[in-house]
Regions:
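Membrane-interface junctions at the ends of membrane-embedded or membrane-associated helices
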Residues: 50-57, 98-111
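Membrane-lumen/periplasm interface segments of specific transmembrane helices
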Residues: 1-52
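Hydrophobic/aromatic-rich transmembrane helices and adjacent perimembrane loops
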Residues: 35-44, 82-102
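Membrane-interface catalytic loops of GT-C/OST-like multi-pass glycosylation enzymes that act
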Residues: 74-90, 126-129
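Signature aromatic-anchored transmembrane alpha helix within multi-pass, membrane-resident enzymes
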Residues: 103-127
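Hydrophobic alpha-helical membrane-interfacial segments at the cytosolic entry of transmembrane helices
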Residues: 1-4, 68, 116
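Hydrophobic, aromatic-rich transmembrane alpha-helices
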Residues: 40-63, 67-74
């Protein structure tokens, strides 16, 4: 209990309320995978690649902590289909991993990949924004 909030009781109450709603119609296994895929698309190919070979210790603590939080949230099944909103605070910490690319040539290449992915998504997906 910190500042009057019991995390365990809150998790149990949230799970009960969530299961009483539309969550019963959403398959857990599908969202365990698709949430992570959507997060990967949101952060882009450069971030996914940077996380794969991240060795810089201070950055690893930030990005790794955000990644651990995302995995725990995903395994709790409390974020089915809500990744774009619920996990948004983790995105900047994950993107920090791209600052550790070895040299300027790598950074430019991955920046181009990020740009291409963003343009492709914007062309393929219809968005009201």
């Amino acid at each position: 209990v910190w500042a009057g909030f019991d995390w365990i009781e809150g998790q149990a109450g949230t799970r009960e309320a969530y299961r009483a709603g539309v969550a019963l119609e959403r398959p857990d296994r599908y969202f365990l995978v698709s949430n992570l895929v959507v997060l990967g698309v949101a952060v882009g190919p450069a971030t996914v690649a940077a996380l794969a070979w991240l060795r810089h210790r201070p950055t690893w603590w930030l990005a790794g902590g955000a990644l651990a939080g995302v995995v725990v949230a995903d395994l709790s099944t409390m974020s089915k289909g809500e990744v774009e909103r619920i996990w948004l605070p983790a995105v900047p910490f994950l993107v920090l991993a791209t600052a550790t690319f070895p040299d300027l040539r790598w950074r430019r290449g991955w920046l181009a990949a990020q740009l291409a992915a963003a343009l492709a998504l914007q062309l393929v997906l219809r968005s009201p924004w």
